[in-house]
Amino acid sequence: MSSFLGRLRRKKDKEQNGHTATSSDGAYQNGNAHRDSLVNDHICIPAQRNSLTVAQQSADIGSGSDHEGIIVKQKPQLAFSLDRLLIDSSALSYFIQYLDSTDKLNLIKFWMHVEGFKSSFSEQIQAAQELSLRDAKSIYDKYIDDGSTSSLALPRKIKQIVDDKLSASPLQKSCFDEAQDFVKSLFEYRYFDEFQNSVYYKKHELEVLSDGCSLADILKVQPLLLSFLEFIKEKEDHDTIQFLLGCDSFEANLDLMEDSEALGDAMALYEKYFSMQATNMIDLGSAIRAEMESLICEESGRPNRKAFRTAKTACFFRLHDKYLSDFLKTSYYHNYLGELQSFIDFTVELPRKVRNRAASSSDVASSTDSLTHAFSRHLEVLEKKMNDKDESTQTPTGSPSSSKRSTPRTPRSSRLAEVDEMGRYHALYDDSHSQTPQKPMRIKSTLRKYLDKNTLREEEIAEEVARTIIRDMQEMVASSAESPTSPTFRYG
């Protein structure tokens, strides 16, 4: 695993702050090749330059910040897509930590071992082919075989395909492709989304954004995007950001739309931002407008994926050159870094799940005893508080309430509720959360108080009669207990 990460780091260093283009950020990365063509009309895009180091201004950052400087980047730095994550050694290390915490480390280990197998595979050299065959057997025994502790539990159909490919001669480089595609689908549809919501992705964000940031990163991070919109004052530049976001959404969903729907969305973007009657005009010149028109209205009836590519590149670099350097100096940006740090510091990382599903009975018993002990301690504290309250409200000896409260309580005899001398139920805990909230009927209560006095009087008399009867019964029982002989009742 370490050798694979090392190769990724060396590859990243050679690319000099770049990465392989993906569908989500390829337009931004490939935009440099079109800067020379963007001098049409009055559009002036400065020549490509190296990354800029933005000196931090202490007045903007606020006290306590330890970020000495943020580098302006032209290419995305954060791993927004799974494809970028799998080739970014730094982001991949956090993804590995996340999978380890969810007891799914075997998935990423299989992926990395297969990538290493492919990179070292050779059909020309006999010794290398024998080594590849040995590696393939090792991968199969560890991850494909159902009896292995690290088995991926592949679907039967995929496992059969892998078996057939490994049985064929000569061995092919693509023998694990179906299994690798299955694992990648698990990453894409489950674990990558969960990773982006975890503390491990926040650590990746903090590490990357503390070193450098691009406009593409800001457009992907919602808190930074909102701060960037607040930082920008000119309305046309607000429209430019909205166009970039709308264009990203259009390109991401283009393959899922019918021709007519795709054409309608493309025309909506064009008419809102670039047509002569645009409501939110972004003036990029007539040449770029004509290019968009020709790529949107093609003979096939479906807009070209590159219809907004030139306009998107021009808008991107306009915002990049005009605002990014100053924005990275502001408290907006550094406050977000502080929020990331606070989130990480105050997040409790739960221990990794137990890998052995069949836990021993002793472990279960130990856990149960611990829980019982903790619950008993809680009852003792609760009982002590209740006894203290009873002592403070205790009436003189001999009264009915005194005899009622004189029974000592232990944790095992603690009650969650009691019934008073009137037969009414009283909870000894706060049960307000379990009761259905009712709106106070203040008018009804007031009317009842002043207009229904007879009913209230009858209720008071009934309660007093009940108290008298109960008191007489208690005195009768007490006197019979003190007499030497009990009365004999005869029937008939």
From Swiss-Prot:
Keyword terms: Repeat, Signal transduction inhibitor
The UniProt record lists the RGS domain at 81-205, 214-337
Region Disordered: which residues? 1-32, 384-418
Skewed-composition ranges (Polar residues): 18-32
Q: Name one GO cellular component term.
A: plasma membrane
UniProt superkingdom? Eukaryota
Respond yes or no to whether keyword Repeat is given for this record: yes
Q: Mind telling me which Pfam families this protein's record contains?
A: RGS (PF00615)
- List, alphabetically, the InterPro entries matched: Cell_Polariz_PKAAnc, RGS, RGS_sf, RGS_subdomain_2
Q: Please list the GO biological process terms of this entry.
A: negative regulation of signal transduction; protein localization
Spans of biased composition, class Low complexity?
393-414
Q: What protein name does the entry list?
A: Regulator of G-protein signaling rgs-5
Q: Which organism is it from?
A: Caenorhabditis elegans
